């Protein structure tokens, strides 16, 4: 009987059998490896991913808001409904992800 060679991920450890079921198996293993080597790098990546998503959504919002320029100006002038609220939402999401990352690993 021919034995198939299997790639072993030391950072993943006992959870290796869960990898094939996960769609992003390699990225999960990579994240586990990064977290094991330096947790601060993983936190840095998480925070910057959120910041990048925020920028993209604002860019799309500007493109869509061309039809009514007065409403667009009002939204920009009002700090309570404008970017400040979006920033709060992003930071809350970062906090949630941070808490999950700290408790799971």
From Swiss-Prot:
Q: Which UniProt keywords apply?
A: Membrane, Transmembrane, Transmembrane helix
GO cellular component, alphabetical, reads: membrane
Protein's membrane topology = Single-pass membrane protein
Region (Disordered) spans which residues?
Answer: 54-89
Record localization: Membrane
Q: According to the lineage, what is the superkingdom?
A: Eukaryota
* TM helices/strands, residue ranges: 25-47
- Add the further remark from the entry: Partially overlaps YFL015C.
- Per its record, how is this protein called by name? Putative uncharacterized membrane protein YFL015W-A
């Amino acid at each position: 009987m021919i034995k198939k060679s299997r790639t072993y991920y030391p950072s993943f450890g006992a959870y290796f059998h869960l990898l094939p079921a996960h769609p992003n198996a390699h990225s999960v293993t990579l994240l586990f490896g990064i977290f094991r080597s330096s947790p601060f790098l993983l936190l840095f990546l998480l925070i910057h991913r959120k910041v990048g998503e925020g920028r993209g959504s604002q860019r799309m919002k500007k493109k869509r808001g061309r039809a009514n320029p007065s409403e667009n100006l009002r939204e920009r002038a009002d700090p309570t409904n404008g970017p400040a609220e979006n920033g709060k939402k992003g930071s809350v999401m970062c906090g949630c992800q941070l808490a999950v990352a700290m408790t799971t690993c």
